[in-house]
Amino acid sequence: MYARLDAILPSSVDREDAESNLNAGEIEYAITALLDDAYTSVGLSDAVVGLIRENYDDGPVIDMLDALLYYQSVKAV
């Protein structure tokens, strides 16, 4: 899942924290870190949101996605 998300994000998205979590075996935290870095760098595209929603129903990844989407909607107002 991490590799699929990583592949659809632009190279400008920082991956240092995400890769650190990935190397530590913390896959979900790697994905949440990658989502956070994507949000702060380029925003969350429909492709990113769709990929996460297709693969997760609950847990830290969905919690992070929902929080970032909330902040993105507030920022857009």
Language-model-derived ranges and their functions:
Residues M1-V77:
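C-terminal-biased regions
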